[in-house]
Regions:
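Nucleotidyltransferase catalytic core that binds NTPs
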Residues: 1-176
């Protein structure tokens, strides 16, 4: 079994690349971290919403999806997380996660992401925060499609999921 771990806030093309790599190798578990997080700019979507985004992207492809609450204790994280995602090979492009799992003698498959900095969650969320001030849906979509898979973009638009970012940043003015 292959495991892809992330917060998926939101599920973006970097995540899609990792999950594709895992699915090509065999049965895959997608582990959604920070499952208990209260809404914030770092974690704007609930674990249920993030799972919906992932399932929308997966379509008819099969993957097991599990939710993992944070424990804020890196030395014990792998033991905690493996209670939810089971044992297998972690597929990652994150150096810190790789080292943490290797230290726990977990097999790790390293995936090299070109332009990884473009797919960092904070950068994607910052762009979405800016887009939350734009009323024109097609303009929003065109920008989002650069870093987010089309089916997830559709989910974000259909569920008015960017509005939450605007509401969390009330000092922003709407444009366009």
């Amino acid at each position: 079994m292959y495991i892809v771990l992330g917060r998926f806030q939101p599920f973006h093309k970097g995540h899609a690349y990792l999950v594709e790599a895992a699915l090509e190798k065999g049965p895959t578990t997608i582990a959604i971290g920070s499952s208990q997080s209260e809404p914030s700019m770092n974690n704007p979507w609930s674990v249920g919403e993030r799972e919906e985004m992932i399932r929308e992207w997966l379509g008819d492809r099969e993957a097991n999806i599990v939710h993992i609450a944070d424990i804020n204790d890196p030395p014990n994280w792998v033991e905690h997380a493996s209670n939810f995602h089971g044992h297998g090979t972690l597929v990652t492009s994150d150096e810190d996660t790789k080292m943490l799992y290797e230290k726990s003698e977990f097999p790790v498959e390293w995936v090299n992401l070109s332009e990884r900095e473009s797919f960092e969650g904070w950068r994607v969320r910052a762009t979405l925060k800016m887009l939350s001030t734009v009323h024109e849906k097609e303009a929003q979509k065109q920008v989002m499609l650069q870093t987010i898979p089309p089916k997830v973009v559709d989910w974000l638009v259909e569920n008015d999921a960017l509005y939450r970012l605007y509401a969390m940043s009330r000092d922003l003015e709407h444009v366009g």
